Amino acid sequence: RVSSTFAPRLANSSISSKTFWHQDMTYWKGDPNKLSVWISLNKVNKQNGSPHYIPGSQRKSFKHIVKGKGKIPLLEAQDINESEKVIIEADIGDIIIHGPHVLHGSEENVSGEERYAIILTYQPTTDISHHRSGLPELIKR
């Protein structure tokens, strides 16, 4: 069984700094069998903060430090080979799916326009660590 905590985090990236490189498992608890589903609500490009990934990073180990907004564990830049970075541009409704160990972040939004995305987390129904109290849950049986 798989569930999604229907806490669609509405990622609003207005004029802002970039999102540091990170792996979701550095701040997720419980079962590592989770997936993030990122749904673009408008066109995403380099100017408005497109996401970026390092292919194969889920098979590597990275040193984490506490850095950035919210004190979420993020990666030290020197641990990352930026030449391997793949920037993802997306259209409205495009979906990006990644596992908890995939290294990712986003570019700085310098467009002057806001960028929105909905982020869902899918996880085993036995894992209550990522559930948010008071929010509906979707379950596939």
What label would you give each PLM region?
Residues R1-A7, K29-P32:
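Signature of the catalytic double-stranded beta-helix
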Residues R1-T5, S50-Y53, I97:
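A structural signal for short, well-ordered beta-strand segments and their strand-loop junctions
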Residues F6, V37-I39, I118-Y122:
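A structural signal for short, well-ordered beta-strand segments
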Residues I15-I87, D127-P136:
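Catalytic core of non-heme Fe(II) oxygenases with the double-stranded beta-helix
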Residues S50, H64-K71, I92-I97, H101-R141:
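Non-heme Fe(II)/2-oxoglutarate
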Residues S4-S17:
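Short, compositionally biased segments
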Residues T5-P8, G56, P100-V102:
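Short, well-ordered beta-to-alpha junction loops that form the rim of enzyme active sites
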